[in-house]
């Protein structure tokens, strides 16, 4: 590989040459912080990823949480354009051009953006570090470049990333995680989240007090949860994890990070305890939803000392939910609060995958508080410590997203990204979004692919097929829809328990899908080998045990490889 490619350029045109070490088949680049003290922006490795229109190959960059997949950029004719995005789920990208075939791995101690450009018939890809926002220069920038064979496939790049992380102990196989009973159970059976109570979201009362707090709507009481469990049993659902959302004081997002006491309008503490015991007695598992990142002023645990401080010296208000304006809690304080609040929750005798909201779906905030400064690297370390602490306390751990720094001890992610849940994102540099995350991490953790694939049986044909092709764990949600006048990122069609007919319909649907999934559950333990985009809208997921799943993403019947595949249908073969 040509080392002249291993340079960076600052905003003044200055060229930065890294220290280079060759080790274990990789090039390790270090851009030393001492050389970056007066730099505002740094364009990283701009010479490494360039290709003329019409060239063979591709760039592959990771999705962020607003996207429906990872960006496969092929060098087809396009008008000049540029596309920039940041906060990616994975911290690596792939370059395959006539000159270079490499996996590029970026240490996650800074926030950075991907910039993909097409200009004068040339495609280019670089990452940009902006030291005027988020983190100032405080550490070296470290990048690993892994040379790949010239004909490397998506599966080869995924396998390289997975194997390196396994060897270094950054992740562990799902087979290892399944030695915990709750995780093995989750592998075989669906998740059923139940949103119980909430105030209007977003709330018209931005700064809530005990005097002006809006009414909480008690939609599913603890007694009603027992009815749902009975209906599941009556419909023959052999196993399920019921996860209660909005069980806490003032309901979902109502007073976070305050949890206790359980909301009286739902039945209070005694009814919660009764419900936990009841669900377990039926042979199901049960867990609760908590949140350490959001803080609203009405919480009895609220303190401004917990809140993230921006580079401008302002408290970081991020989110507008049932409790009004929410402020993000510094990672250092999130861990403190988890250790303060979660032991009381753990004493309730829960036996499912405890759910801490948000922590695995965002890159940790940069906090510039003088009392508790926390830059990205420290934030990630503290997030990992929080996940570890919570997992050891409850026995298993789940969260909202699947950021790669969280995966070692994340047993299940509610969705890899929001997909098109907030609307389709226009990405002018590609027309192909691929499941590179799933290709890399299937067999490492359980996940649901996107927020629209929650409640997948009642969603669009594309959502249902996406769920299957990307290897998801069945994930259902009673009352997923709760936002007023804003997008509901899990969709506008829903499962509800407002009357017995609706509840029993949902239970019957879950029973059918649980039975179908039973024959696929063992495949969760198997790595994906490749994911191929064929002609005629056929996509193929290939597993390392020889299993192949062919999906027809079109409205027309397709003949492929000796198989007839119905519109939006699929075929499994070995």
Task: List each model region and its residues.
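Aromatic-lined carbohydrate-binding/catalytic grooves of carbohydrate-active enzymes
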Residues: 188-337, 351-353, 360-371
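Residues that cap or initiate secondary-structure elements
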Residues: 24, 35-37, 48, 248, ...
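Active-site-proximal substrate-binding groove within the catalytic cores of carbohydrate-active enzymes
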Residues: 96-155, 211-213, 299, 306-322, ...
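Intrinsically disordered, low-complexity acidic/polar segments
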Residues: 38-40, 251, 295-297, 559-560
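A broadly tuned preference for mixed-charge, low-complexity surface segments
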Residues: 77-88, 183-201, 283-301, 337-346, ...
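Glycine-rich, histidine-containing beta strand-loop boundary motifs that form or position
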Residues: 33, 43-46, 244-246, 288-292, ...
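Carbohydrate-recognition beta-sandwich/jelly-roll modules
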Residues: 1-241, 285, 568-570
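Hydrophobic, Leu/Ile/Phe/Ala-enriched alpha-helical segments that form helix-helix packing faces
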Residues: 1, 35, 161-168, 225-233, ...
């Amino acid at each position: 590989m040509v080392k002249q490619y291993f340079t960076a350029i600052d905003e003044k045109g200055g060229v930065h040459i890294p220290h280079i070490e060759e080790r274990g088949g990789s090039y390790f680049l270090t851009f030393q912080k001492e050389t970056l003290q007066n730099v505002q922006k740094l364009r990283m490795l701009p010479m490494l990823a360039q290709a003329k229109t019409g060239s063979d190959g591709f760039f592959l960059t990771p999705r962020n949480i607003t996207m429906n997949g990872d960006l496969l950029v092929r060098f087809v004719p396009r008008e000049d354009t540029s596309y920039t995005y940041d906060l990616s789920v994975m911290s690596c990208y792939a370059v395959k051009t006539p000159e270079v075939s490499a996996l590029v791995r970026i240490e996650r101690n800074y926030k950075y953006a991907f910039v993909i450009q097409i200009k004068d018939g040339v495609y280019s890809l670089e990452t940009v570090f902006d030291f005027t926002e988020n983190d100032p220069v405080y550490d070296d920038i470290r990048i690993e470049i892994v040379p790949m064979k010239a004909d490397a496939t998506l599966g080869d790049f995924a396998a390289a990333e997975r194997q390196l992380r396994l060897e270094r102990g950054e992740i562990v196989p799902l087979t290892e995680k399944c030695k915990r009973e709750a995780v093995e159970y989750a592998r075989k059976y669906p998740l059923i989240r139940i949103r119980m109570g909430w105030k209007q979201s977003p709330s018209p009362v931005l700064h809530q007090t005990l005097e002006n707090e809006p009414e909480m709507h008690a939609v599913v009481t603890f007694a009603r949860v027992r009815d749902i469990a009975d209906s599941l049993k009556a419909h023959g659902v052999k196993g399920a994890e019921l996860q209660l959302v909005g069980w806490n004081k003032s309901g979902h997002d109502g007073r976070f990070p305050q949890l206790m006491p359980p909301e009286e309008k739902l039945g209070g503490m005694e009814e919660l305890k009764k419900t936990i015991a009841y669900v377990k007695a039926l042979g199901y598992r049960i867990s609760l939803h908590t949140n350490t990142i959001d803080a609203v002023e009405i919480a009895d645990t609220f303190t401004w000392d917990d809140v993230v401080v921006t580079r401008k010296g302002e408290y970081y208000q991020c989110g507008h939910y049932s409790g009004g304006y929410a402020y993000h809690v510094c990672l250092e304080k999130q861990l403190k609060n988890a250790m303060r609040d979660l032991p009381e929750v753990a004493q309730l005798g829960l036996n499912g995958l405890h759910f801490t909201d948000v922590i695995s779906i965002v890159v940790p905030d940069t906090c510039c508080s003088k009392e508790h400064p926390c830059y990205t690297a420290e934030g990630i370390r503290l997030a990992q410590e929080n996940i570890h602490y919570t997992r050891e306390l409850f026995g298993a751990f789940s969260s909202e997203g699947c950021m790669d720094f969280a995966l070692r001890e994340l047993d299940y992610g509610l969705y890899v990204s929001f997909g098109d849940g907030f609307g389709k994102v226009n990405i002018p540099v590609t027309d192909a979004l691929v499941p590179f995350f799933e290709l890399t991490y299937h067999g490492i953790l359980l996940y649901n692919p996107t927020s629209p694939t929650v409640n997948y049986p009642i969603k669009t044909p594309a959502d249902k097929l996406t769920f299957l092709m990307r290897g998801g764990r069945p994930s259902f949600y009673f009352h997923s829809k709760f936002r007023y006048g804003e997008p509901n990122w899990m969709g506008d069609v829903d499962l509800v328990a407002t009357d017995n007919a609706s509840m029993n319909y949902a239970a019957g649907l879950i029973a059918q899908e649980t039975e179908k999934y039973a024959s696929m559950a063992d495949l969760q333990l198997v790595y994906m080998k490749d994911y191929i985009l064929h002609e005629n809208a056929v996509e193929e997921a290939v597993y390392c045990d020889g299993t192949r799943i062919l999906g027809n993403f079109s409205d027309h019947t397709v003949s492929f490889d000796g198989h007839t595949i119905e519109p939006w249908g699929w075929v499994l073969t070995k």
